[in-house]
Amino acid sequence: MTVAVVGCGRIGAMYAHHLDALGPHHLVCVDAEPARAEKLAQETASATVAASVGELVARGCDAALVTAGTTAHPELVEALVEAGVPTLCEKPLAIDLPRTEALGTLAERHGVPLWVGFQRHFDPGFADLRARTVAGRLGRVQLLRLVSHDVSPPPVDRLRQSGTVFTDLMLHDFDMVRWLTGREIVQVVADGAALSCPELADIGDFDTVTAMVRLDDDTLGVLSAGRWQPLGYDVRAEVLGERGNLENGPTGANAPGAGGEAPRFRGYWDRFATAYRAQVRAFLTMAAGGPADPAAGTWRDSHDALRCALAAERSATSGSVPVAP
């Protein structure tokens, strides 16, 4: 089985190493910077390099993971889908709704599987939280609390290309609210500040944001996201219902403690290592002709999470007025 990693930066390298561990297959590395593709190919078993997606398709490819920069996603996904290659694209498919929908409908028209990398769907803790919530173990859900805080922000030049903290980071949380409850978000009230990284204000972005959401059954949610949490990567969720509360995530993982403990998680790659590997395994199974995993992120998940993130942007830049996605 020939599998391509298109985009050989940090997240592409992470996926390549998961693919290595899951083998056997032939890995092809593709990147706009040939040296980066060569370096990753040398680090992984049974890997070669293709100069472009066009060359990759001409040589033959059974599945592809798009892990390039956000602005490159639409063009790469379009080329792969039109060539009939099952594709897993890191979120988001695009940073605007029309292109997201266009890519999704293109995949449906061609009958090509298109997954979006919402790896939290494959995290055992989040999956268990969803199963218990949807099964009614908590009774009527009243409130959700979600936290997503990075250790440190990416370079500003990269952030210029990836959208705001709402569409880049909190996008996961909007997706999780929908996925955990099976409900739709109908109102968003958001706010933000550039506290630790004031330079983000120059590009119309924030490093610390909050969002309050209302679902279509009047359940409420409180979301927070941030670019700066030096004590460790902090992602967790709590669902509060009539019969009790359930939570996922190391709520005490980032407490400094008396001795100033080391961070438990350095970033998404170790916090969600199990989830990423499970997602890749499920994707390869599907691409090889097996069943599609119901946990897989879809283009509609990406579209609807982006719709909420853009509503949060509008709210935060308009004096925190309520916005309907």
UniProtKB/Swiss-Prot annotation:
Single GO biological process annotation from the record: antibiotic biosynthetic process
Activity's dependence on pH: Optimum pH is 10.5-11.
Enzyme Commission number(s): 1.1.1.-
Record's keyword annotation contains Oxidoreductase: yes
SUPFAM superfamilies: Glyceraldehyde-3-phosphate dehydrogenase-like, C-terminal domain (SSF55347), NAD(P)-binding Rossmann-fold domains (SSF51735)
InterPro entries: Gfo/Idh/MocA-like_OxRdtase_N (IPR000683), GFO_IDH_MocA-like_dom (IPR055170), NAD(P)-bd_dom_sf (IPR036291)
Listed GO MF terms: nucleotide binding; oxidoreductase activity
Pfam families: GFO_IDH_MocA, GFO_IDH_MocA_C3
Enzyme class: oxidoreductase
Family: Belongs to the Gfo/Idh/MocA family.
Protein's UniProt name: Myo-inositol dehydrogenase Hyg17
Classification lineage: Bacteria, Bacillati, Actinomycetota, Actinomycetes, Kitasatosporales
